[in-house]
Curated annotation (Swiss-Prot):
Glycosylation sites recorded in the entry for this protein: 35
Protein name as catalogued: GPI-specific phospholipase A2-like PGAP3
Species annotation: Xenopus laevis
Localisation per UniProt entry: Golgi apparatus membrane
PANTHER family according to UniProt: PER1-RELATED, POST-GPI ATTACHMENT TO PROTEINS FACTOR 3
CC per GO annotation: endoplasmic reticulum membrane; Golgi membrane
One of the Pfam families matching this protein, by short name: Per1
GO term, biological process aspect, one: GPI anchor biosynthetic process
């Protein structure tokens, strides 16, 4: 979900201390030459588990994984801090899961979002003005968590981009959701025009990051800007309507908690037991917020139905 999160996307560097280490580079080169050519490559493929082949793990990937741990062991033996590799901490692979804890947390976030989607559909009549917009937001959110799960399962150039792009789509769609709720019901033409602008903005954002080298700094700055707009808009509306709609505390609490929990990312410590890091903790901590946010969406939709129903009742003089 994370519709208000400013720090939803953190830029990563393309190179880190670990993968710049000559020991690591030499290890990968030797491993590649000795194991990833000719009959040895055939032996590797014959011994490689099916689930590893299906998820795209290559001989070179296996060399990098083994050399990463070889380098880490040397660092620890000599009393140095654990280094990062390619912008990430070293994680202990489980089956084909590259980052098991983050993958599990992303999956659970997706399940929570999907369950709340079903609950919203079962408790809110389709005649509600915000019904389709809320369902669309829910599906965008589920899709984002799906790609987050895939990315943490197997980090490739494609899965990384899909994770970033889908996360951006959640923030932008949350802005549209807020626009619909604050202006769109009274002025549909404004909401339609703004929605078209957001689609164009999203297309330009993706094009810039896809056509050239992926600009992590721009990506972080752009999504931070999207997040600030989203955050301030929702908070302003909640503060303005707080005396008329008492359930808005749920929306405010989600906003505040998401921003507070994002601070976990700043801890950035080596994974505990080589599995659980700050990023995974952040993802785990957002799971309960789905229930609170969708409770707000349900209450707000039912409130709109009640207001419209009361307006339709003829007044007796």
């Amino acid at each position: 979900m994370a519709p208000f999160l400013v720090l939803f996307l953190a830029g990563v560097v393309s190179a880190s201390r670990g993968d710049r280490e000559p020991v690591y580079r030499d290890c990968v080169t030797v491993c590649d030459q000795n194991n990833c050519t000719g009959f040895r490559l055939r032996d590797f493929r014959a011994q490689q588990p099916l689930y590893m082949r299906l998820t795209g793990w290559t001989c070179l990937d296996d060399c990098r994984y083994k050399c990463m741990w070889y380098t880490v062991s040397l660092y620890l033996k000599e009393g140095h801090e654990v280094p990062q590799f390619h912008g990430k901490w070293p994680f202990s692979r489980f089956l084909f899961f590259q980052e098991p804890a983050s993958a599990l947390a992303s999956f659970l976030n997706g399940v929570a979002s999907l369950l709340m989607l079903f609950r919203y559909r079962s408790s809110v009549p389709s005649s509600c003005q915000m019904y389709r917009t809320c369902l669309a937001f829910s599906m965008v959110s589920v899709n984002a968590w799906f790609w987050s799960t895939i990315f943490h399962t197997r980090d490739t150039a494609l899965t990384e981009k899909m994770d970033y792009f889908c996360a951006s789509s959640v923030i932008l769609h949350s802005i549209y959701l807020c626009c619909m709720r604050t202006f769109g019901l009274q002025y549909p033409s404004i909401a339609n025009a703004f929605g078209a602008f957001l689609v164009l903005l999203f297309a330009c954002h993706i094009s810039y990051l896809t056509l050239g080298r992926f600009d992590y700094s721009y990506n972080m700055a752009a999504n931070t800007s999207f997040g600030i707009v989203n955050l301030m808009w929702w908070l302003a509306w909640c503060m303005w309507r707080r005396f008329h709609q008492p359930y808005l505390w749920k929306c405010v609490l989600v906003v505040v908690l998401l921003q507070s929990l994002a601070l976990l990312e700043l801890l950035d410590f080596p994974p505990v037991m080589w599995i659980l890091d700050a990023h995974a903790l952040w993802h785990f901590s957002t799971i309960p917020l789905h229930f609170l946010f969708y409770s707000f969406l349900r209450d707000d939709s039912l409130y709109l139905l009640k207001v419209n129903h009361d307006d339709d009742i003829p007044k007796l003089d």
